[in-house]
Amino acid sequence: DDSETWKFVGNLPLTQFYKVAVNNAKPFYPIFGGPQDNGSAGGPSATDEIEGIANKHWYKTLFADGHQSATDPVYNNIVYAETQQGGLYRIDLTSGEKVSIQPQASDGEPHERFNWDAPILVSPHKPSRLYFASYRVWKSENRGDEWIPISGDLTRNENRIELPIMGRKQGWNNAWDVGAMSNYN
């Protein structure tokens, strides 16, 4: 009918997750992840409702471009989620508190260069221990309240905007490109 009428179908599982993580909550462990261009979200792996898993079962855990999520293997109310370029947050699902826990360079050090989708790992042996990476690997013993670097520079420290592509250097004024991915190799 030339697009005169539309129907909303609310049970199609349509989103693209970068990565997913699960926790140990019962009866149905939740799934957390960063859907592309859609913040970070959580939802059940199953439900006992006759309609199955629906949109109403999913909830936002973080804003912006969602990326990797991680869970605490002991405290099911603690989730970690991140935005692009290493914007790491610890989220308390009970209180709703969101705390930025991104590692920061010390005075006199160069700024931290994070990957578009920076890796995070929660230790399965000591859940308060986190590992996170910028151009170097960081470790926290207190769920991200404090960080120490445990490696040197693991990159080539090349600014990709300044590298020639097909014989031509790009510029910072390429709006389609700046911030669309990692800026450094």
What are these model-derived regions, one by one?
Residues D1-N185:
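Beta-propeller blade termini and top-face loops
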